[in-house]
């Protein structure tokens, strides 16, 4: 069961002292069951004790800012000090489904920053005199993170003085430029006086490089399906991935996944250190497209052990 496995994964992450566990908003995707993101955050938070739980992220233009403020205000009231609100502007789905969600593509670039300001206003204690209030939500200390994969999101996060989570796990092209823009133009805020970067990357670890490579075929098949616009559930790993993709698909997938850490403990350690030496991020966020649940749990354990050996910053 997908939800039960997700809770098991979150409990395992908590046991391993991962900092946070985030869930993404996606719609009309057979391989992802987190369309009701706020509901699942409550489910995971209720089944764990201390790990932070949040959205990675809420696709804000799909929603009313007030509704999101109320939902996350409720979550924060139920699980104080444990809720994160990551927000993005992408639809999290295909164009037809985006229309079904009531999304208006004409004014998103202007409306998204305004929606973030609305959230901040609804969460502010000073909003108590307003005609429209988020109850619960008002006065809640809920950190807002801006998600993105472009320089636009980097500029916005810097201007608003908010932490920045970059989607390097599927759109790495602008990562270096986005980080430079964010750091160079950061405007300190009361809640976040310093810039804070989370690098979202793919991670598949196993006892050996060979085993990890075999597990990674599920990840590759998932991205092949994206290229082919073939929305299927995740597939078990195959013996020969070259029999599945053609040369053009292979090149495209490997380009999208070039910040993927796949291997045994020694290989993972080397790759993580090279990445950190270059980007110097504040936090790693690991996503693992692994078909077998036990192998997935083991992968996160290996990453935790490697990060501890390296004395790196937070891992989520």
Predicted regions and their residues:
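Flexible, glycine-rich active-site loops centered on histidine and acidic residues
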Residues: 1, 61-124, 164
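Active-site mouth loops of central-metabolism enzymes
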Residues: 1-3, 58-66, 138-148, 256-265
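N-terminal beta1-alpha1-beta2 module of alpha/beta enzyme domains
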Residues: 1-51
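An alpha-helical appendage that flanks or caps ligand/catalytic pockets
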Residues: 105-133, 174-279, 308-315
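A conserved active-site cap/scaffold subdomain adjacent to cofactor or substrate pockets
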Residues: 152-173, 179
């Amino acid at each position: 069961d997908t939800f039960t496995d997700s809770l098991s994964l979150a409990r395992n992450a908590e046991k391993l002292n991962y900092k946070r566990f985030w869930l993404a908003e996606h719609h009309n995707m057979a391989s992802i069951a987190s369309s009701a993101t706020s509901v699942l955050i409550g489910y995971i938070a209720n089944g764990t004790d201390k790990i932070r739980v949040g959205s990675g992220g809420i696709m804000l233009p799909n929603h009313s800012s007030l509704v999101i403020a109320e939902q996350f205000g409720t979550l924060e009231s139920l699980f104080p000090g444990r809720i994160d609100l990551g927000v993005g502007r992408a639809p999290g789905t295909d164009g037809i489904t985006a229309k079904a969600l009531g999304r208006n593509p004409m004014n998103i670039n202007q409306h998204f920053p305004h929606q973030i300001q609305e959230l901040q206003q609804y969460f502010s204690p000073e909003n108590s005199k307003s005609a429209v209030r988020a109850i619960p939500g008002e006065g809640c200390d809920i950190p807002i993170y801006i998600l993105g994969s472009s320089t636009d999101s980097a500029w916005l996060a810097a201007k608003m003085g908010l932490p920045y989570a970059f989607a390097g796990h599927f759109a790495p092209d602008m990562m270096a430029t986005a980080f430079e823009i964010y750091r160079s133009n950061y405007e300190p805020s009361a809640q976040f006086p310093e810039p804070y970067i989370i690098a979202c990357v793919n991670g598949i670890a196993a006892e050996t490089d060979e085993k990890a490579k075999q597990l990674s075929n599920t990840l590759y098949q998932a991205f092949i399906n994206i290229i082919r616009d073939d929305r299927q559930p995740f597939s078990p790993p195959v013996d020969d991935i070259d029999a599945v993709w053609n040369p053009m698909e292979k090149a495209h997938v490997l380009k999208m996944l070039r910040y993927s850490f796949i291997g045994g403990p020694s290989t993972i350690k080397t790759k993580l250190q090279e990445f950190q030496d270059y980007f110097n991020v504040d936090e790693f966020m690991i996503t693992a497209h692994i078909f077998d649940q036990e192998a997935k749990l083991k992968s996160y354990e290996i990453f935790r052990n490697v990060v501890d050996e390296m004395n790196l910053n937070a891992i989520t």
